[in-house]
């Protein structure tokens, strides 16, 4: 069988992923011109490469239409419930670091932890006749973190279609759940991350779709071992 590896199609993620596969003895070349979205691995005739966006990679992995992919852990865990039953996180690759965090306005001086935020959420409806509004693109991770891990139920999620960090200032939400690398954008928008408000430390991962056909395919384990050895 042919094994398909989905890799980022552009930018730093593409360069970093390609460098790791190069070190793993799996040099990748595009098939056709530089704009091609197909590739091959030199010396690995039973492996093909598809160049996709990070969000496309996570979707194709979750649906099992590719065998391996390099994408952010945040995208996988947001995209699918019980994701570990669908995929295996084979290796964390050491690039694409970012945290999914809970951030509140800096002027909320008495809110430093999720417990503090729980108190605010409970009091919010009585004071404002509405639930605490959270702007985010990460509704699944937000629900799991607030409701399951911290027992906070009195909130509503506002889908963020643009710059999430601007939502509190614009009045479209009270707080946010967003991804950040340095925190500088949050600080520029007068937001602070709660002390225990990191939902996920994310980075780029080598992810394998769980397929029964992989059990009898030696190249699957060979790919995993080669990449791990290159880290």
UniProtKB/Swiss-Prot annotation:
Gene3D superfamilies: Periplasmic binding protein-like II. Pathway: Amino-acid biosynthesis; L-histidine biosynthesis; L-histidine from 5-phospho-alpha-D-ribose 1-diphosphate: step 1/9. One of its GO terms (molecular function) is ATP phosphoribosyltransferase activity. GO terms for cellular component: cytoplasm. Transmembrane segments: none annotated. It is found in: Cytoplasm. The keyword Membrane does not apply. Disulfide bonds: none annotated. PROSITE patterns: ATP_P_PHORIBOSYLTR (PS01316). Heteromultimer composed of HisG and HisZ subunits. This is ATP phosphoribosyltransferase. The lineage of its organism: Bacteria, Pseudomonadati, Pseudomonadota, Alphaproteobacteria, Hyphomicrobiales.
């Amino acid at each position: 069988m042919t094994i398909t590896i989905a890799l980022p199609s552009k930018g730093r993620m593409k360069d970093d992923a390609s460098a790791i596969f190069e070190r793993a003895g799996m040099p990748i070349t595009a098939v056709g011109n530089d704009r091609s979205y197909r590739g091959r691995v030199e010396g690995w005739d039973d492996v093909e490469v598809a160049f996709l966006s990070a969000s496309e990679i996570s979707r194709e992995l979750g649906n099992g239409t590719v065998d391996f992919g390099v994408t952010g852990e945040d995208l996988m865990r947001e995209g699918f419930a019980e994701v570990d039953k669908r995929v295996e996180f084979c290796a964390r690759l050491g690039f694409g670091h970012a945290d999914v965090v809970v951030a509140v306005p800096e002027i909320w001086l008495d809110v430093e932890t999720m417990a503090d935020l729980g108190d605010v959420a409970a009091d919010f409806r009585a004071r404002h006749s509405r639930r605490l509004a959270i702007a985010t693109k990460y509704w699944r991770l937000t629900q799991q973190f607030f409701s399951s891990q911290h027992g906070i139920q009195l909130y509503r999620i506002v889908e963020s279609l643009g710059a999430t960090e601007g939502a509190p200032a614009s009045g479209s939400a009270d707080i946010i759940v967003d991804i950040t690398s340095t925190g500088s954008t949050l600080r520029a928008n007068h937001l602070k991350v709660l002390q225990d408000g990191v939902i996920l430390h994310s980075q780029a991962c080598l992810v394998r779709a769980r397929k029964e056909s992989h059990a009898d395919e030696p190249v699957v384990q060979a790919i995993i071992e080669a990449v791990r050895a290159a880290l």
